[in-house]
């Protein structure tokens, strides 16, 4: 079998650069990335809360306030987390709908992708 591929001068497995990325595959990859990002954020947040509650609260609160985090950093961080959360929620809903076998036609795929992008844009605008 290996000789057959060697004779035809074809690669055994096609390279990723051969394919053009499809919107549904990009959204699936971004869904996984947003899930990892949310898991990292919530785990870090819970560990941070646990540390604050397990030790001297007033001392830790004064230390936290003394960091003097800029208001813009807090706003962008909240926006980033909100965007990840809603993207993961909307795209997860889409994956659940697909698991039930609905909206698998190409026209529905592109319409739902457009709906996802528009809804995330509206969240960014009205946040």
Curated annotation (Swiss-Prot):
Organism annotation: Chondrus crispus
Domain of life: Eukaryota
Subcellular location: Mitochondrion inner membrane
Transmembrane segments: 36-53, 60-83, 109-126
Biological process per Gene Ontology, one example term: mitochondrial electron transport, succinate to ubiquinone
Gene Ontology molecular function: electron transfer activity; metal ion binding
Similarity remark: Belongs to the cytochrome b560 family.
Known function: Membrane-anchoring subunit of succinate dehydrogenase (SDH) that is involved in complex II of the mitochondrial electron transport chain and is responsible for transferring electrons from succinate to ubiquinone (coenzyme Q).
GO cellular component terms given for this protein: mitochondrial inner membrane
Cofactor-binding details, from the entry: The heme is bound between the two transmembrane subunits.
UniProt cofactor(s): heme
Subunit structure: Forms part of complex II containing four subunits: a 70 kDa flavoprotein (FP), a 27 kDa iron-sulfur protein (IP), a cytochrome B and a membrane-anchoring protein.
Pathway assigned in UniProt: Carbohydrate metabolism; tricarboxylic acid cycle
Membrane topology: Multi-pass membrane protein
Keyword Transmembrane attached: yes
Keywords: Electron transport, Heme, Iron, Membrane, Metal-binding, Mitochondrion, Mitochondrion inner membrane, Transmembrane, Transmembrane helix, Transport, Tricarboxylic acid cycle
Protein's recorded name: Succinate dehydrogenase cytochrome b560 subunit
